[in-house]
Amino acid sequence: MNNTSTRSFNNWQVRTIIYTMVGYALFYFVRKNFSIAMPGLTAEFGISKVSLGLFLTLHGIIYGLSRFVNGIIADRGSAKVVASVGLMLCAVANIIFGVSDFVANWIVVLAAKMGTTLTFSTVLVYCMGIIWVINGYLQGMGIPPFTKIMTHWIHPDELATKMSVWNMSHSIGAGLVFGLCGWVIMPHLGLDMSANAEVVQTITANLGANASYEDVLNFSQHFGAWRLCFLIPAAFALLGSLGIFTLVKNSPSEVGLPEVVQKKSATVQTAEEKAEYNAFVRRKVFGNRLIWTLGLANFFVYVVRFAALDWGPTMLTESKGLSLAMATTLCIVFEFIGGNIGMVFWGWLTDKFFNSKAHRTCVLCMVGAAVTVATFWAIPAGTAWWIQILPFTLLGFFVYGPQALLGISAANQATNRAAATANGILGIFGYASTLISGVGFGYVAQHYGWNGAYLTILIMAILGAITLMTMWGAKANGYEE
């Protein structure tokens, strides 16, 4: 490229990274809002940890399968269309979830008119579960197309560093929605029903014998705030879907610039091209041992990550004695400081010292995560927040290294022709992890206490490190083959 083309390319590359970062952060707005709303759902409706964990598990499994399906779709079509439509539909699902209690009540009334008696609480759990599973599928329309777009805009030799910066969108999205819901919505919005004896009695019963007067008062003074945790982020997501569609370009060629790697496109026209492409995908993805090893490692990484992210507000309040606002603060620091610094640092280290061999960096990260989990577990309940915040932040620093780098490694191994498909496989493994981090984690916490839950996280971190060690000698990418 000449100087003019280079300047134009650099400008478009930066714009594309920023636009897609904002877009994917907004996917998190309509996904991780659920974590902050969980205590409110328990307080108002008595939904158990097992049920909440089941929501997370089903959502995660469907999301993983959706990432695989939509990875294939994105590799063969317009990535930005897949992403923009997906974000719009996620917003719609969140709006419906925000009024799901009204939907459940309507179903109960309608059934009664037809001579059938249904229990409101049961119908509500089913309604919420179905809506959140649908949202799980729609969420899978986010990362595969964005991964494809990035592999077209970033050279493989720079992918670890620049994609680590891009992956800050995970932490930015989760951190912002945690702040919006945990600092603004839950503590300040909703209806003040503290003078309503029936509401106070219901909340007291739902929270159980260990509930403090302060907790009961807080939830009764902000009754219904949980629904705004879904409605307000959905409004941002609707605007974001329009932005993705109008601003993002799938590849440099769409704006008259040369591709960063001159390889055949995934887009196929003739039967011969289709056969050649399918053979390529079988060899680089489905028949590639490294992709499956990275997928298994992703399973363990996501258990650790989701245990801290999805259960963080509940786990920190119940096992460490923190208020919901302070637990939210720790989760935000886990994301914003630990996660963002970790992703950028480990991405830079990968390109600088490990010759873009991201899998080697991930071994160090998982060993660090295991040590940090053990340290945090050992801190007694009631310990000052400023002591607890350091190991919890370090956990984010370590776990977000492989969270970002495993997908980069898979994209490099599969090349940009099949990057989204490879990341779809990683998505299946990653979100199959919710079998443990979702309903499994909820069951262990409810029946065996938080010590059992912490032990589960520690074992997963150790297994992740061992899995990654098996591919220590692998090449950095599959372009040379």
Regions found by a protein language model. Give the residues of each.
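Juxtamembrane intracellular "pre-TM" segments in multi-pass secondary transporters
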Residues: 2-10, 254-293
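Residue-level signature of mid-helix packing/kink "hotspots" within the transmembrane helices
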Residues: 32, 60-68, 140, 174-175, ...
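Extracytoplasmic gate region of multi-pass secondary transporters
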Residues: 34-38, 181, 288-344, 403, ...
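Cytoplasmic membrane-interface "Motif A"-like loop-to-helix N-cap segments
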Residues: 76-87, 351-366
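C-terminal ends and interior cores of transmembrane alpha-helices
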Residues: 88-121, 367-381
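Cytoplasmic helix-loop-helix junction between adjacent transmembrane helices
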Residues: 131-169
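Helix-loop-helix hairpin linking two adjacent transmembrane segments in secondary transporters
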Residues: 166-252
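C-terminal transmembrane helical hairpin of 12-TM major facilitator-type secondary transporters
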Residues: 356-406
